[in-house]
Curated annotation (Swiss-Prot):
It catalyses: L-lysyl-[protein] + 3 S-adenosyl-L-methionine = N(6),N(6),N(6)-trimethyl-L-lysyl-[protein] + 3 S-adenosyl-L-homocysteine + 3 H(+). Keywords: Cytoplasm, Methyltransferase, S-adenosyl-L-methionine, Transferase. It is an enzyme of class 2 (transferase). Its main location: cytoplasm. It is found in: Cytoplasm. PANTHER family: ELECTRON TRANSFER FLAVOPROTEIN BETA SUBUNIT LYSINE METHYLTRANSFERASE (PTHR43648:SF1). Belongs to the methyltransferase superfamily. PrmA family. One of its GO terms (molecular function) is protein-lysine N-methyltransferase activity. InterPro entries: Ribosomal_L11_MeTrfase_PrmA, Ribosomal_PrmA_MeTrfase, SAM-dependent_MTases_sf. The lineage of its organism: Bacteria, Bacillati, Bacillota, Bacilli, Lactobacillales. One of its GO terms (cellular component) is cytoplasm. This is Ribosomal protein L11 methyltransferase. It comes from Streptococcus pyogenes serotype M1.
Length: 317
C-alpha cells in the first residue's frame, strides 16, 4: 500500500493563497485549509453551534506528498519562500511546519472534510467537485477541485474580486483574468455572462489547474487559458481586466491594463494589503485610471478602476 507524507503549515490567514501556491509548486498532490473563521458563529448539520472553536488569525494549510519525496528539502523550500513572502510585506505570522505519514486511503479522504459548498456572493456559490448540490433559482454554481486549488474562492481577496465581477458584468463582455490560479474568477465571469474570457498565469501548474477546474463546469468553452507573464504581449482589448495577485506585481501591469481596457471599461485589482494600498493607487492613477470602488475586508483591499472621460463620481486619474 502506498503511503503519503502530510505537511501542515501554520501561518497567518493573510498568507493563505500565497502559501497554497508554494505547496503546489513544491509537488503537493493537494492542499486543505483549516480556518477557525469558517466556523465562528456557524451551526453544524444538527443545528448546534461549534462550541470549542477559538478565533485565531492563524490557519493550518495541509499538503500531501508521495512517500518518495524528500521532506527535508520540501520544508527548507517552504521556509525560504515564506521568508520571501514576508519581505514583500505579506503577514505570515509565527510559522510552524509539522509532518506525518498517511496511508493511501487516509490521504484520499482526509482533505475533503475541510470543504463544503460556500455562498460567496448574492449569486455565486462555490461547490467542491465531488458534492451533489441543488442550486436555488438564480444561483450560479462554480465547481472547483480544492485539492488542486491555488485558492478556493473563500479568501477575502477572491471574495471581493467575485463581488466586483458580479456588480460589473451584464453579459457579452470580454474579460482578461491575470494570474488566474484556480481559474475561479474566469469561471465566475463565464457564469455571469461574459462572452469571452482570456486567463493567463506565469505558472504552468496554475495553467493546468485552471483548465482542470474549468472543465468541471459546463458552458465554459468561452474561457481560453494560456501561460503568460502578466499582460506582456497581449493585444486583445477587454471590457474588464481582473487581477488578484500581490500588490508588488499589480503595479507592474497597470500601464498594459490601460492600453488594453476599452473606453468605459474596468480594471479590478485585489490582493492588496493595507500598507501597499497607496502604491497601487498611485500606479493606477499614473496609468490614467479613475477609482470607482474601494472594498476592504480586514487587512485586504480590492479596487475597481474605470477608464473614462466622465469623472463624475470617480477619484484620481
Amino acid at each position: 500500500m502506498e503511503t503519503w507524507q502530510e505537511v501542515t503549515v501554520h501561518v497567518h490567514r493573510d498568507a493563505q493563497e500565497a502559501v497554497s501556491h508554494v505547496l503546489i509548486e513544491t509537488g503537493s498532490q493537494g492542499v486543505a485549509i483549516a480556518d477557525s473563521a469558517d466556523y465562528i458563529g456557524q451551526k453544524d448539520r444538527f443545528g448546534e453551534l461549534y462550541p470549542d472553536v477559538e478565533q485565531s488569525d492563524m490557519i493550518a494549510i495541509t499538503a500531501y506528498y508521495p512517500s518518495s519525496t524528500n521532506l527535508a528539502d520540501i520544508i527548507a523550500t517552504i521556509n525560504e519562500q515564506l521568508a520571501e513572502l514576508a519581505s514583500f510585506g505579506l503577514q505570515v505570522g509565527q510559522v510552524t511546519v509539522d509532518s506525518q505519514e498517511l496511508a493511501e486511503e487516509d490521504w484520499a479522504d482526509n482533505w475533503k472534510k475541510y470543504y463544503e459548498p460556500a455562498r460567496i456572493t448574492h449569486d455565486l456559490t462555490i461547490v467542491p467537485s465531488w458534492t451533489d448540490y441543488d442550486a436555488s433559482a438564480g444561483e450560479k454554481v462554480i465547481k472547483l477541485d480544492p485539492g488542486m486549488a491555488f485558492g478556493t474562492g473563500t479568501h477575502p481577496t477572491t471574495k471581493m474580486s467575485l463581488f466586483a465581477l458580479e456588480q460589473i458584468l451584464r453579459g457579452g463582455e470580454t474579460v482578461i483574468d491575470v494570474g488566474t490560479g484556480s481559474g475561479v474568477l474566469s469561471i465566475a465571469s463565464s457564469l455571469l455572462g461574459a462572452k469571452t474570457i482570456y486567463a493567463y498565469d506565469l505558472d504552468d501548474v496554475a495553467v493546468r489547474v485552471a483548465q482542470d477546474n474549468i472543465d468541471l463546469n459546463q458552458g465554459t468553452d468561452n474561457i481560453h487559458v494560456a501561460a503568460g507573464d502578466l499582460l506582456k504581449g497581449v493585444s486583445q482589448e477587454a471590457d474588464v481586466i481582473v487581477a488578484n495577485i500581490l500588490a508588488d506585481i499589480l503595479v507592474l501591469l497597470t500601464d498594459d491594463a490601460y492600453r488594453l481596457v476599452k473606453k468605459e471599461g474596468y480594471l479590478i485589482l485585489s490582493g492588496i494589503i493595507s500598507e501597499k494600498l497607496d502604491m497601487v493607487l498611485e500606479a493606477a492613477f499614473s496609468a490614467g485610471f479613475f477609482l470607482e470602488t474601494h472594498m476592504v475586508q480586514g487587512e485586504w483591499n480590492a479596487l475597481v478602476f474605470k477608464k473614462t472621460d466622465d469623472i463624475s463620481g470617480v477619484i484620481g486619474g
